[in-house]
UniProtKB/Swiss-Prot annotation:
It comes from Drosophila virilis. Pfam families: Maelstrom. One of its GO terms (cellular component) is perinuclear region of cytoplasm. Residues 2-69 bind DNA. This is Protein maelstrom. Gene3D superfamilies: High mobility group box domain. Belongs to the maelstrom family. Involved both in the piRNA and miRNA metabolic processes. As a component of the meiotic nuage, plays a central role during oogenesis by repressing transposable elements and preventing their mobilization, which is essential for the germline integrity. Repression of transposable elements is mediated via the piRNA metabolic process, which mediates the repression of transposable elements during meiosis by forming complexes composed of piRNAs and Piwi proteins and governs the repression of transposons. One of its GO terms (biological process) is germ-line stem cell population maintenance. It comes from the Eukaryota. The keyword Nucleotide-binding does not apply. It is found in: Cytoplasm; Nucleus. The keyword Metal-binding does not apply.
Amino acid sequence: MPPKKHTGFMMFVQEWRRNDAEGRKMSMPQAVSKCGELWKKMDAQQRGPYNGAAKEADVVMRCKVERMNCHGQALSAVQREEREAADRQMDMKRKIERMVLNGKAQHDLENTKFIFAAFNYFTKAITNDIYIPAEFAACEFSLKSGKSSLYSSHINPGQLIFGQGSDTLHHTSNTHQLPLPPNALGEANIGKLYVSIVEYLRGCQDGAGQPNEPLVVFTSTELVPVVRGCFRYLESDSDELQENIEVYDIQYLFYVLKKEVMDIADLPNEHINKSITDNLFVNDFFEYHSGISCQFHEDNDRGKYCTQSKVARWCYMFSDYMCGDLAIKPLPGKHMPPKQEPKFRVINPEEPIENRCFSGMTTTEKSSGNTSFASISSLQTEVKHEIVDHSAFSANLNASEDFPSLGGRKGKRNAEPLAKGVWNVPASNCSVKDLGDAFNMPRR
């Protein structure tokens, strides 16, 4: 049953009860009876405001109250944001697929260039999605050329968000360990840095034949909001015309590119799905490789979190899983980490202990009051490492001489087969008298 509509007369009754001292003492039926006489004496002009108020009350009543979630947000607004996010995600996937398919259609997929970018940050604003950047790195990549260029810079934002020093210290100490502002490293002129980054990205994209399109960079799934927030922070401090920088998911690019590469190589790709490629991407084979991060992170053993190392490792992962399908020869420093001389020495366990000392140490010899110094490194000889069995246990488990107890066990009582009709019960040492006494015991 629909709700009853408001009437001008009832609006007049409610107002009269609120304003009249006599009306406040009356019940609703009494007030209706009293106001009925007054309503009859009123003309159309006097009744107009009450009739208008009744129509407005009907409109308000028809408007449903918006449902809220546990955070006090309107459910319709939350659902609208979710739909918009899903649409943006689908649009991003279509654009990534279009980029890869265009290169495949031109038979030039191995020369299609992509820009990989990553940010390290100090902290995130609580009220919005702005991140305070600490380090930036970007590189240009193609399957044939590998990592062709690199841009890397530390960033000094000058100051942190008030009240977030503890969160910033906790985050940085567990990740990149860069010094906090105002002692941060790198460029302090944010506007100049933003212009420099845009020039580099535009130069890479213009070389790919896309001068008028938005700048597109790829980063890992977990870093997509970080890269967007850091670019937004850099834009806010720049007086230049802001560029449209779109941040795409590199892991979806990895999946699409792998399938198309296998299709070009005429290899079956039905078993390739995003879960497999994501697992390959997350299990970073080059994660702890040295010599590919910035000097600060190399000195502090934090190369895993360095942005320069991240973008380089992404290039190496793409090359490692795809160049072989296209018969592209990998080059050190382009498709794989540069070769490095080993900084260790293999020691033969059979070598005397005096020859295992550090090469920098010296020995002192005294002869007839004269002291001479001789470097131990001159006494060391080049040793070829041989595999030596260091097992502490070398006995034969089946040899009775090594384990005398193997042959000392007692034989089984019924080793021989029993005769037919003989019970397989062990012999009892009890006499007949003992058995009889057992049956005659009093029972409780």
